[in-house]
Amino acid sequence: DEWDCVIRNSDDKELVHSYLQFLHSLFKSEESKAFLALGYITGILPIKKIKDESALNNFREYTMLKSKPITKYYGFTEEEVKQLCHKYDMDFDSVKAWYNGYLIDGVHMYNPNSVTQAMIDQDCDSYWRNTSSFSSINTFITMNYAGLKDDIMTMLAGGKVIVDTRSFQNDLSDIHSKDDALTALIHLGYLGYDADRKSAYIPNYEVAEAFQMALKTGIWDEISKAISRCDELLMATIDGDETKVAEIIEQAHDTYTSVLKYNDENSLSCVLTMAYFTAPGYYNIVREMPAGKGFADFA
C-alpha cells in the first residue's frame, strides 16, 4: 500500500532512482520469478515514467484517467448514493452537489469517505479539511506557467479547461508545464477529468471549498478578498439589500473580468458564479435556468 510515498514526498532524485531500482528487483527481475506469483500495489500516483515509459511496465494500471473494468469500485456510484440517502433520510440533491462530480470512464463517482461521514453525521459538510490538502493545491495553482491562473479561474466559475495529460511523468517534483500541474491535481483528486472532452474541472462543492481555503493561504490576495465576501453577498441577497448586493457584485466584476470583456455575457456569468461562490453550501444551484423570456444565469 502507498507504493508512491517516496515519489510524492521526496525531491531527492537519487533516492527516487534507488527506490525504483528496488521495486524493479522486487517485481520485475529474474530472481523475483522464484518467489512472486502476483503483485498488487496501490497508491495515489500511477507508476513513475522513465523516458515516457513506466518503470514497471509489467503492471496493469488503473488510474483516475483510465479505470475500466473496475470503475464502479473507485467510490460510491450514483445509484448507491441514492440508496444511502433513502436509508439515512438525506436529501439526494444536496449530497450530489457536495460530493458528486468525478466522471471516471463515463461513470459518475462520489467520494466514499465524505458520503459515509455525511450519512453518519446527518450533515453535508466538507470532510476534506486537513491542511496538507491546501498546501498540495497551492503548490500547483501558484506555479508560474502561462494560462494556469486563467484556467483555475475558469474552473472555479464552474467551467472546464482542456488539459493534455500525456506529458505528466507521474512525479510531483517533475512538473514542467500547466498541463503537468493540472494532471497532478487530477491524480490527487482535486480535479475531475472528462475523458471525452479531455478537460479538467472542479468536481463538487467539497473540493471547491478546499480550493477556497487554499486561495486564502496562498498568494491570490485579490481573489481571496472577493471570495471572503461571498457569504455577505448571499445574506444581503436574502435580506433584499440591493445596495449591498450591487456593491459586492461590482467588486466581483472588477476582480474577475478584464476591461476588454467587462460587459461580455460569459464574463458576467462568471462574475455571478464567483460572487456566489459559497452559495452551493446552502442551496442547490441551477445554471442557465429557463426564466420565461431567456434564461437565468444563476438560480
Q: Where does each model-flagged region fall?
A:
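Hydrophobic, well-ordered secondary-structure elements that form the walls
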Residues: 185, 272, 298
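Phosphate-binding site recognition
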Residues: 1-266, 278-286
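Active-site metal-binding core of divalent-cation-utilizing nuclease and nuclease-like domains
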Residues: 280-299
